[in-house]
Amino acid sequence: MPEKHVRLGSEHPLWDRIQIVLISSFIVVMLFDNVSTLSFGYPSILERVSAYPILLLPAVFLIAFGVYLVKESHAAVFAKTVEPKFVDSGVYSIVRHPMYLGGLMILLGFLFLKFSLIAFVIWVVYFVLCDWMASYEEKDLLRVLGKEYADYQSRVPKWLVFSKVRTRK
């Protein structure tokens, strides 16, 4: 019989659908912008060639680090365990929401490669909703784990990996 993954906290029931809609919209807009750039010639090839090398390195870093965060956070959270366990090691020791941050970094990396104002607006909306969802989950984790999670919040930043700001009180 397959083992069922046991969760400590809860997730908003519509969150998966919201993510699918936003990420799909982002991808469609990016693809449409690429087609329209080829069709209408804006921005010029010269502008793209001159800016591309400058933006390539941060884009690759954002995408690679984002993939790393998502991969490692999934491995930690979805590891088969007999009882649910609070994970505060690995990527969870540097940021409280590595899955969300990883996804945001991947999309931001693609924005560096091919900027689209509409896709940027979608990214901002996605960030705001990720922050809302993270806060929703944290309230539940505080209820379930109490002081253990409150201590974790004081040690580990919510979003900014290298930030000294740990949590809102």
What are these regions (language model features)?
Residues 91-105:
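Membrane-interface loop-to-helix entry segments
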Residues 1-88, 104-169:
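Membrane-anchoring alpha-helices and their flanking helix-loop junctions
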